[in-house]
Amino acid sequence: MNRKLSIFSAFVTFTMMIVLLMGGTVTKTDSGNGCGTDWPLCHGELIPTNPSVETMIEYSHRAVTGVVGLLIIALCLWTLVAFKDRLDIKIFAFLAFIFMLIQSIVGAGAVVWQQSDLVMALHFGISLISFASLLILTILIMERSGQEFRESVPAFLRKLLYGLLIYTLIVVYTGAFVRHVGATYACVGWPVCSQPTMTFEAWVQMIHRILAGLLFFYTLFVHYTAIRLKHRTSRTGMLFATFFISCQVATGAWIVLGGHATYVPLLHAFLITCYFGVISYLAYHAFRTRKKDSRLR
């Protein structure tokens, strides 16, 4: 294990989490136009003068994202040199970089061209994929040299994990869409909307709740399957996933029933990020143990 590289990779993964939470702050405070329609400048300036609160939030998000982007590039180059014979590490380093780049392009496009809500809802999901790639990359770097995984994931559980990963992205997209169309408080009551008439925003909110509820029960089923099949890694990972998704549902209800403070939606975003990271690793672990050779070469 390359100790210095492991520490650096873990640090970069942490900074990517910060980027995600700062992006959530931009959305929650409606600060996306805090720098006007200029990018990468802010109101035509490299450093804004007399900035408003919204400008400070948007500008700091851009600045941190730029720094983290450079850190990811440095991490990719370092891993390419340190692990010349590891295709799996190269792939996740590339994924972390490319999705960070796509996220930045989508964010810039939103400022310059005022993208639709359908497009902007992709932004958070793209960032999640970059974060998950960094997390898996860090775990791979930290593994002992020559370590093998002989505990193959049963085919049924493996397929469940693949499906859970894909379905999670769908639910994440609907959650981001709820925020971007301003539907967070469109429903009165929880878990169902109790108002007599349903607006478009209320339907968007209700559909997300239904899909999120199904994700919760899907997670419980996968956890139960991992326990029944006695697969240690999946069982432990799904225990964490179940904890995160349970807290996620609770914070979702909290937001609707009175959690108007900025930190509540940020906690909601933090929990789904942790959940997605766990599920992503478990899905990849299932993928690489499908054959005797535990690594991509």
From Swiss-Prot:
It comes from the Bacteria. It is a multi-pass membrane protein. Its EC number is 1.17.99.9. GO terms for cellular component: plasma membrane. The gene is ctaA. It comes from Exiguobacterium sibiricum (strain DSM 17290 / CCUG 55495 / CIP 109462 / JCM 13490 / 255-15). Heme b binds at H208, H268. Pathway: Porphyrin-containing compound metabolism; heme A biosynthesis; heme A from heme O: step 1/1. This is Heme A synthase. GO terms for molecular function: metal ion binding; oxidoreductase activity, acting on NAD(P)H, heme protein as acceptor. Residues 1-6, 84-90, 143-160, 223-236, 284-297 are cytoplasmic. The chain crosses the membrane at residues 7-27, 63-83, 91-111, 122-142, 161-181, 202-222, 237-257, 263-283. Catalyzes the conversion of heme O to heme A by two successive hydroxylations of the methyl group at C8. The first hydroxylation forms heme I, the second hydroxylation results in an unstable dihydroxymethyl group, which spontaneously dehydrates, resulting in the formyl group of heme A. The N-half (TM1-TM4) and C-half (TM5-TM8) domains are connected by an intracellular loop. Each domain is formed from four-helix bundles and they align in a pseudo twofold symmetry manner. The N-half domain is the substrate-heme O binding domain and the C-half domain is the cofactor heme B binding domain. One of its GO terms (biological process) is heme A biosynthetic process.
